[in-house]
């Protein structure tokens, strides 16, 4: 009996540990919003397809004949395409009804973040670059008689089903998406009198929420990996939207970087992502204020600081890190990458210096001050590039910050990227171009909404927008297929992720610069509220802190000046500029 009890205890322990650290992850069933296409309009091969958009109890029954009827023969493969209304991290549960023949039936299921992707097969459409990398998006499975089968998880909005077996009848009762996500409350909110900006904010927040799985991923279709540089916009979005309820998940992601890549390894094999890791630690600390956690990171931080220092010329101050990287669009230009890395090193040491101040490590403070002074001796040409100009402004490396901001304005959308677009808008704000930043957000991120996006993308090359077809429709003849025909580098064609967390910058920008709220003391014990409405008439929202929710409403006075009204919980001091 004791042995049995011990075994039960061990099983319970194992089951408990399997879910430890992710109790907030839930699954909800989602019904398709529409049947977009069927292979047959006559009813001979596909009949009653709209049944799939009706509510379903989740249980098949022997007397339930309310089914979609699919038949295939040698001349026709019965197929249909369904739309779940929004992109999500999900699998499918497919229910088959009762039929005379009780043999399993073979079907093919194809996911798509776009209509084009769902209608593409790897074997047939290789030029469009559909792929099963990182997560399967094309399955051949068997459906049981009077039962259900499930498919694996990925990121998608659309799903195509093909009946592969010939001369059989499939009674398809229902197809539901199993939406898997962290059921966090939106503690941070944003609303203004511009609905386009409201939609951009909520889409940015939702994009990150979908990527908050066992860890914080870059994308729910691909790569489903923890990229420590991509995490910077994601962490800032998490802090401004989900707040304290998600801090443990941020710890888990950051710890993955330091424990998974012990020094002298660079995190993710990319030096710049190790630099971002230090910046991420400081950013998180300002929102969370967890000093014991930060102190525990000191040995790694100090070791990493010295590792970076070894890659700086002691006379000229020139960074000489091999394998520098900003984002993919700038990667072919080594001059731009070097300029950006020079600025990023300064930002890193500035973050490390502040960490030293708060942890009482004066030696770290002095070392970082020395390295920052050395790096400022070298100001490389940045080719007036948007990404490098942005980092020059944010790091203080600019000789003339207004000129660097003007580079961003002059380059327009053609040099924006979904990752570094946040830093471009922040650089515009730092130099007083608040309305320009709002216009850029509306134009660049809004373009994705105009093309049918429900999450923001890994990349958007803006020059293709004008003639592009929507991702939630069949692309008309003569229109540019923004998914299949676009992309570059590691995201060519349909490999491009359409739900990428690094694209969430507007959620940060609108909270930090329109509502105007930022922490200026660790743990948000003191916050600064400096709103900039631009051409907006009002904005309101909430901001999460460890002490509770801050409520902010911003209006304009008779002179057009932004006037904030703030309700803060006990323990949060509010200062204004």
Language-model-detected regions and their locations in the chain:
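Bacterial Sec-dependent N-terminal signal peptides
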Residues: 1-21
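Active-site acid/base region of carbohydrate-active enzymes
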Residues: 117, 158, 169-170, 174-203, ...
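Beta-rich accessory regions
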Residues: 21-109, 354-379, 433, 520-577
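Extracellular/oxidizing-compartment recognition motifs
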Residues: 21-214, 230, 244-249, 254, ...
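Repeat-solenoid scaffold signature
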Residues: 412-451
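Alpha-helical repeat scaffolds
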Residues: 401-410
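Non-catalytic C-terminal accessory modules of carbohydrate-active enzymes
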Residues: 24, 44-45, 118, 370, ...
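Long, ordered, helix-rich scaffold segments
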Residues: 347, 384-389, 405-406, 415-420
């Amino acid at each position: 009996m004791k042995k049995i009890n011990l075994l039960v205890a061990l099983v319970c322990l194992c089951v408990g540990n399997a879910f430890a650290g992710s109790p907030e992850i839930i699954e909800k069933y989602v019904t398709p919003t529409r049947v977009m296409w069927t292979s047959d309009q006559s009813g001979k091969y596909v009949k009653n397809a709209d049944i799939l958009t009706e509510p379903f109890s989740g249980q098949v029954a022997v007397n339930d004949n309310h089914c979609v009827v699919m038949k295939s023969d040698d001349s026709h493969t019965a197929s249909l395409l369904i739309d779940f209304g929004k992109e999500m991290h999900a699998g499918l549960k497919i229910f088959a009804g009762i039929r005379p023949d009780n043999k399993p039936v073979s079907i093919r299921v194809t996911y798509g973040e776009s209509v084009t992707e769902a209608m593409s097969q790897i074997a047939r459409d290789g030029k469009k670059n559909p792929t099963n990398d990182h997560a399967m998006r094309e399955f051949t499975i068997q459906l049981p008689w009077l039962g259900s089968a499930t498919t694996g998880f990925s990121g998608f909005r659309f799903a195509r089903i093909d009946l592969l077996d010939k001369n059989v009848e499939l009674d398809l009762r229902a197809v539901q998406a199993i939406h898997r996500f962290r059921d966090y409350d939106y503690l941070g909110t944003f609303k203004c009198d511009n609905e386009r900006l409201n939609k951009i904010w909520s889409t940015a927040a939702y994009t990150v929420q979908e990527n908050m799985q066992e860890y914080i991923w870059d994308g729910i279709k691909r790569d489903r990996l923890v990229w420590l540089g991509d995490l910077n916009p994601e962490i800032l979005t998490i802090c401004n939207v989900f707040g304290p309820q998600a801090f443990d998940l941020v710890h888990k992601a950051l710890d993955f970087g330091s424990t998974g890549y012990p020094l002298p390894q660079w995190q993710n094999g990319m030096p710049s992502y190790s630099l971002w890791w230090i910046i991420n630690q400081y950013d998180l600390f300002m929102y969370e204020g967890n000093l014991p956690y930060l102190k525990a990171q000191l040995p790694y931080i100090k070791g990493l600081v010295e590792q970076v220092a070894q890659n700086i010329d002691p006379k000229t101050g020139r960074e000489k890190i091999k394998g520098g990287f900003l984002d993919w669009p700038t990667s072919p230009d080594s001059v731009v990458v070097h300029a950006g890395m020079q600025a990023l090193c300064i930002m890193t040491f500035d973050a490390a210096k502040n960490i030293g101040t708060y942890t009482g490590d004066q030696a770290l403070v002095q070392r970082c001050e020395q390295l920052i002074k050395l790096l400022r001796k070298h100001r490389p040409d940045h080719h007036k590039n948007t990404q490098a100009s942005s980092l020059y402004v944010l790091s203080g490396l600019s000789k003339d910050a207004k000129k660097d901001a003007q580079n961003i304005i002059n380059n327009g959308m053609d040099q924006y990227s979904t990752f570094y677009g946040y830093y471009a808008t922040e650089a515009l704000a730092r130099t007083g171009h608040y309305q320009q930043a709002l216009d850029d957000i509306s134009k660049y991120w809004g373009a994705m909404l105009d093309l049918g996006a429900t999450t923001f993308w890994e990349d958007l090359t803006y020059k293709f927008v004008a003639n592009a077809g929507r991702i939630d429709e069949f692309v008309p003849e003569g229109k540019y297929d923004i998914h299949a025909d676009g992309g570059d580098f590691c995201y060519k064609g349909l490999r491009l992720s359409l739900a990428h967390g690094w694209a969430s910058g507007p959620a940060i920008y609108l909270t930090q610069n329109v509502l105007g709220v930022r922490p200026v003391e660790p743990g948000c014990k003191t916050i600064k509220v400096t709103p900039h409405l631009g051409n907006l008439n009002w904005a309101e929202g909430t901001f999460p802190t460890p002490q509770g929710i801050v409520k902010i409403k911003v209006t304009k006075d008779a002179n057009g000046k932004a006037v904030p009204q703030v309700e803060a919980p006990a323990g949060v001091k509010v200062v204004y500029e």
